[in-house]
Amino acid sequence: MYIKMATVANGQPDNSSLSSNPTGHMNGLTHSPGGAATIPMKDHDAIKLFIGQIPRNLDEKDLKPLFEEFGKIYELTVLKDRFTGMHKGCAFLTYCERESALKAQSALHEQKTLPGMNRPIQVKPADSESRGGCAFVKYSSHAEAQAAINALHGSQTMPGASSSLVVKFADTDKERTMRRMQQMAGQMGMFNPMAIQFGAYGAYAQALMQQQAAIMASVAQGGYLNPMAAFAAAQMQQMAALNMNGLAAAPMTPTSGGSTPPGITAPAVPSIPSPIGVNGFTGIPAQANGQPAAEAVFANGIHPYPAQSPTAADPLQQAYAGVQQYAAAYPAAYGQISQAFPQPPPMIPQQQREGPEGCNLFIYHLPQEFGDAELMQMFLPFGFVSFDNPASAQAAIQAMNGFQIGMKRLKVQLKRPKDANRPY
């Protein structure tokens, strides 16, 4: 609670300190002709009233004549947003006498509709639970605060409370700011587009890591390496890379590259002799010309394509792009599979974009620790800092200009045209 004290000079009160009220509260202070101020007294059982359905263009001085006819006013406060300063359409009213509050409630509550409002005015006792039932305590050292948490958290139930005492460290300004923005986004029925854009990529990445782990474990134990498993893992990485670039990737099926090419009769796979290869892989029987059988190289019945001209496009090479990173896991017999396939498509860097004229915002007083992610999260309820229409930009300015972060308030305004000669 902050108390404003009147200053005294030469034994007389300084009326200048009483005439100005920076908080916007209007109370019942009266001034005698001699300059001395009389502080009003209120009953010990005075009622604090909540006033709702007030036009947003009416301030304390406009509302005071309406309520003064029921008695002397002790305090009248119009509620405004602490960050934007916007009128909330409600107020708190306290009379000096309890009877005045009861008369005002009986005469006004849902009995009179103020100009510009669709519903009648609400006059009722303020909720005593509006304080939130919480408080902040600041210690001189972190150790003292930790000792208080250890001693008091959950140790007792205060009189009138329904649960035990909760003592914990308060959120930082940055955490509170992010939570308020998330709540605002939820109230506006909005969602995070980043989760939609990269949700599929997260699933692909998780499946890719699991597939890689299974392949490496199989090779380490000397087991058989199925080329189709390697192709499936390469497919996941290929689709993940394409999704990150915003491209649609069609999944590869086992029949796309594993079936026999048209016009080729699948010969019988020769019998495999006893293991003589490396890491437990079986040897490959040699043909008369000294070359290994194609069927043994491409196991599981995957057959090679016939020789083509250098200019002809190989559909197998296009379908299995991105398998080269798995070459280290293959034995020598499988090395030529990865050599024929190119690298996956690189990530396409996103260039900085600007919206149309009148839709770009310039923001002052951002904390140094705020990056693109925090800035994006703050302005997600409005689209982003650059909008595609002036109406969204104006809505963001009205809601975010003056928003407090830490010890400073944001200053949000339209970006000046490029031909303006004045700096920001």
From Swiss-Prot:
GO terms for biological process: mRNA processing; positive regulation of mRNA splicing, via spliceosome. Pfam families: RRM_1. GO terms for molecular function: RNA binding. InterPro entries: CELF3/4/5/6_RRM1 (IPR034648), Nucleotide-bd_a/b_plait_sf (IPR012677), RBD_domain_sf (IPR035979), RRM_dom (IPR000504). Residues 8-27 are annotated as: Disordered. Keywords: Cytoplasm, mRNA processing, Nucleus, Repeat, RNA-binding. Residues 47-128, 342-417 form the RRM domain. The keyword Repeat applies. Its main location: nucleus. Belongs to the CELF/BRUNOL family. This is CUGBP Elav-like family member 4.
